[in-house]
Amino acid sequence: MASAAEQMAANLSWGALGKATELRQRIWFTLGLLIIYRLGTYIPVPGIDGASLRNFMDQAQSGIGGILSMFTGGALGRMGVFALGIMPYISASIIVQLMASMVPALEQLKKEGETGRKKINQYTRYGTVALALFQAWGLAVSLEHGNLAHEPGMFFRASVVITLVGGTMFLMWLGEQITARGIGNGISLIIFVGIVAEIPGHLAQFLAQGRSGAISTPVILGVIVMVAAVIGFVVFMERALRKIHIQYPRRQVGMKIYDGQSSHLPIKVNPAGVIPAIFASSLLLLPVTISTFSGNQTGPVMSTVLAYFGPGQPLYLLFFAAMIVFFTYFYTFNVSFKTEDVAENLKNQGGFIPGIRPGKRTEDYLTYVVTRVLVIGSAYLAFVCLLPEIIRDQLAIPFYFGGTSVLIVVSVVMDTINQVQSHLLAHQYEGLIEKSQLRGKRGKTGTAKPRKAPARR
C-alpha cells in the first residue's frame, strides 16, 4: 500500500508551479545565471586572430576540436573568456577526491561534517586556480605557435592567462550560486547548457551533409534511431534499482508496542551518475588540448600522444572505457554510496537485513551486492559512451557527437525534474499544514462555551 507521500507525489500537478513562489524565484534565478554564462561564451579573449581560429576549428571539428567545443558550449571555438569551461574545476575535484582516499589528513576532514566539507571545497578551489593557470598558459603558448595571435609576446600570454583563469573562476562561482539558490546542480547545468547550445548547429550541419549527398539517407535515419534508442536506454538504466529488504524490530514507546516495520534500501544500477563519464572525458582532454592548438609545432612526444589517443583510436577507446570503469567504482564506494556509513546508519536506527548481522557483516554484504551491481552499471556507462564514438568513426560523420553528451543531457534533465517535483511536494505539504492549523483554530472557536449573561436583580 502506497504511503501518503507517494500518493501525493503521484497526484502532483504541475499547475501548482504557479503557486510555488519560492520555486519560481529559484527557476528564474537559475535561468538568469545560465543566460549570463551563454553571453560570456561570445566575449572574445583579446589579441586572437578570429579568421585563423575559425579555419583551425573547422578543420578540427570532427575530432578533438569538436569535443572541446561541445564541453565548453562553443566558447573554445570562439576563444571566449569561458574557453577553459568548467573542466579545471572538475579535474581539481578528481585530484582532491583521489587524495582524500589516500591521505589520512584529508580522510579525517571528510569525517568532520560540514566544517571538513568546507575545507575540502576550499582545497578544490585552490586546485582549480592552479590547473586553470597551467592550462591557460599552455593554451596561450599554443596559440602563438599556431599563428593564431595578432601580436605574440609576454603581454599576450599574460592577458590570455588572466582572462581565462578569471572566466573559469567566475563559472565556478556561477555553479555554486545555482546549486545554493537555484534549481539543480550548478556545475552539471553549466555543462548541460553548453552541450544543448551546440546541438542545433551540429544538427543543421548533419542534415546539410545529407542534402548534399555526402551522407546517405539510410545513415541519417540510422543515426537518428540510434540516438533515440540510446536516450531511452539511458532513461531506463538511470531508473533501474536493486532493492535490499530492511527489517526493523518491534519497539515499545511508553505503554504502547509498535509492530516491526519493513522497508527497502534502493541501490541504483548506476549510483555514480554522470560523474565517471565527465571525469574520464576531462582527463582525456587534458593532455591533448595543448598539443592540438600547437599545430605542427608539437614535439615528438605530443605528436605520438595525439596520434594514439585521438578520438576514435583503439587506445583512446580502451583508455576511455578503463577510466569509466575505474571512476564508477571509485566514486561509488568513496562518495555516493559508502557501505561503511550505510551499515552504521542502519545499525543506529535499529534496522537490519534479514539473515545478516548488523555491523561488519552488513557492510561486507552491501559491498558484495554493490560490487556486482556496478559490473552492470560500469558496462552500461562504457557502452553508452563508446558506441557513438565507434559509429562516428566507422561512418566518417564530419562532426562530434558522443555518448557522454547524451548521458549528461538525460541525467541532468532527470535530476532537475526530480528537484522541481521535490520543491512542489514540499510546497504542497506546507499548504496542507497551514489548512490543518486554520481548521484547528476554527474548531476551537466553534466549540468555545458562550459567556453567561449577568443575572437580573
Segment roles from a protein language model:
Residues 1-110, 115-457:
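N-terminal cationic and glycine-rich segments that engage phosphates or anionic surfaces
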